UniProtKB/Swiss-Prot annotation:
This is Leucine--tRNA ligase. It is found in: Cytoplasm. A motif ('KMSKS' region) lies at residues 630-634. Keywords: Aminoacyl-tRNA synthetase, ATP-binding, Cytoplasm, Ligase, Nucleotide-binding, Protein biosynthesis. It catalyses: tRNA(Leu) + L-leucine + ATP = L-leucyl-tRNA(Leu) + AMP + diphosphate. GO terms for cellular component: cytosol. One of its GO terms (biological process) is leucyl-tRNA aminoacylation. NCBIfam families: leuS_bact.
Amino acid sequence: MHEQYQPRDIEVAAQQKWEKTAAFKAVEDASRPKYYCLSMFPYPSGKLHMGHVRNYTIGDVLSRYMALKGYNVLQPMGWDAFGMPAENAALKNQVAPAAWTYSNIEYMKTQLKSLGFAIDWEREVTTCKPDYYRWEQWLFTRLFEKGVIYRKNGVVNWDPVDQTVLANEQVIDGRGWRSGALVEKREIPMYYFGITQYADELLADLDTLDWPPQVATMQRNWIGKSFGADVRFAYDEASIGSAGELTVYTTRPDTLMGATYVAVAAEHPLATQAAANDPALQAFIAKCKAGSVAEADMATMEKEGMPTGLFVVHPLTGAKLPVWVANYVLMSYGSGAVMAVPAHDERDFAFANKYALPIQQVIALKEGDATFDASTWQDWYATKDDSTRLVNSGKYDGLDFQGAFDAIVADLAAKAAGEKKTQYRLRDWGISRQRYWGCPIPIIHCDSCGDVPVPADQLPVVLPENVVPDGSGNPLAKMPEFYETTCPCCGKPARRETDTMDTFVESSWYFARYASPDCATGMVDDRARYWLNVDQYIGGIEHAILHLLYARFFNKLMRDEGLLANDEPFQRLLTQGMVVCETFYRDLDNGSKEWITPADVVIERDGKGKIIAATHKADGLPVVVGGIEKMSKSKNNGVDPQALIEQYGADTARLFMMFAAPPSQSLEWSDAGVEGAYRFLKRLYKIVSEYVAGGVAERFVAGELTADEKALRLKLHTTIQKVSDDFGVRQQFNTAIAAVMELLNLFDRTEASRAVRQEVLESVVVLLSPIVPHICETLWSALKPGSELLAQRWPEVDPAALVQDEIELVVQVNGKLRGSVRVAADAGRDVIEAAALAHEQVRKFMDGQPAKKVIVVPGRLVNIVV
């Protein structure tokens, strides 16, 4: 054993050993309980960032812990390799996305290996490889034939200069992010997954999962099951010119008597009709169509509208209600129309006040003296519970929410003007992307036969990999060698679909492919029934809705195809917090900011650790402290994991990541914290090194012990208890590390036999090995020559060690801590009082005064009141 801790040598040796012995190869074994631990796989962007390191270290700690507990562990890794960043990089660097992607994968794989993760690399999957995506193409054809996937027109953002479709986030102030051209809304044919067919099951099964409550709530809200009614407003034939009806869905039919107008989307047929001879309305509709349809933007944008001059008829009162075109109504939601009750909906209230539309109160509170003011919104206006009653509603006056709901819906049904309806906020998933770097959609368009799925024996439809996009549309649509084909049904010339799939499709089933990644006959084989579902899934909360919902949906699709036996993909979910760091910048003359990496800044702090001055290393001049934010390229506040590993070693990086904060909370980067982690590992190495220099021993099993030895063993076994609970139940690794540090502090100051010291050190090495596996490999080899750390079992708590002959009690004087005393575990009150009153520090703070009262809390403390 080397005298000094040398992380580089230790880590290389351990990693080579693990690779040579295939230490983490997962093999199905029906005789052992399995544990499938999965961290969300990375996009191969080029380099790992600290968020990756934190995510994968958490998964590795849990995987190694469960292996020590005797479980058959699977921890795989792969690459979410399709997507826009590769196309953007290809444009910038004039290189094929495939070459850029594969190069990044090789580098990032080296980085992951240097961190010592217990990954079974034989199960690696790469989603841009045909042997992966051929099976999602196969599933696509099956679902298309069953009607779960269908084709219909959808609205997209079209860049007329680049001749391409843009994602919502690529539209900036109504213009294309690259060309700067005004973006148009276009209707084009797209493919959709019928996820709404599974809405009820997706909602109900959330109750079976061990997920953070906030994630389950986010999914429930996204699915958005609501109970309401369809209400049909007959066309006013005098203004519209024909018979017909406008159907709207509302969750508040109880407020129908307060409806004063209806609003339709810019694409609605009534809007189109009204605009035919109205240039101002045409311009407004064009403006609406050019605007963002992203929900976040819709929620914050100013609500605008224009009257159409058309009217519909209120189904209960016969009143004529004006039809408005409004920018907050989307054609893709429901019927593209809403009824407006300004008095009891905050958005409608603001709109009605802006355009001087009628506001009719129909709800009042049963108790209190709250009055309705049509100029000022109050939260109680939107109340729907037993505390309200209807007013100004004719025969419905006095009814509460549920009574009014039922009565009004019954009357609508009697008039054939409406009925109860359960609706979902969730919409079917449009997966067509007019992009190159994605999985080709396996459909052939034939003039005679229509849309024909590619037969299974012609799959995969391989994406050409030697293409360098030029930014002007989808390259596949310009490649006759790709799209020219023959119809599988009639043999006539036909055209292959050139759209590719949303990259969320690949990440929706990768968890299942890991179970049998080499299966050449299907998406999965019988090995999936052994490994699935995933016992522990780890990733950022930013994926709480889309990725996690789509993966749950895919699991059910695969189950219904007979491929999987389980209903849900991920039994337990851990959402780790962000890695954050200080930001620094200087204001430039052009109004922008120059962000300066923290490594180039000299910081001065006050006694409480607050930054009071910051200067640039290069010129010594001040820089502005921008605050703590998520590590990012845009703020230049990232720390390169590779530099950290090279300076301190992977174990230091892992230890800091696990010690600095609980997994679910944000982790604030701290150079001092990294130094502290490194110092602890040096100290651990030194303790074991000095002990081993005196010769190793057999660990303590049974025998006579001194009081100090008993105290040390008590601390050891309570630490084992705590670390086991922190790892296996609470998943709070920072407190587990703190407990081991406390144990080592006691170890350092306790005289004990070599057998007891051996027991403590062996246990410490095993307890820490999931977090810092490299150093623990070396320390174990020194403590137990000839045995393998990975073959060990997690330490068991010795009940005998928890039985105390003596206990330590805290002693307070007037409620303030002044010392502690050790007494026999069965000591009586008199003995405890005498010991406390005889304590030197206690006598000092009593200052000769007699004790008015002595309070003894058994097993915990003594409080002397003077």
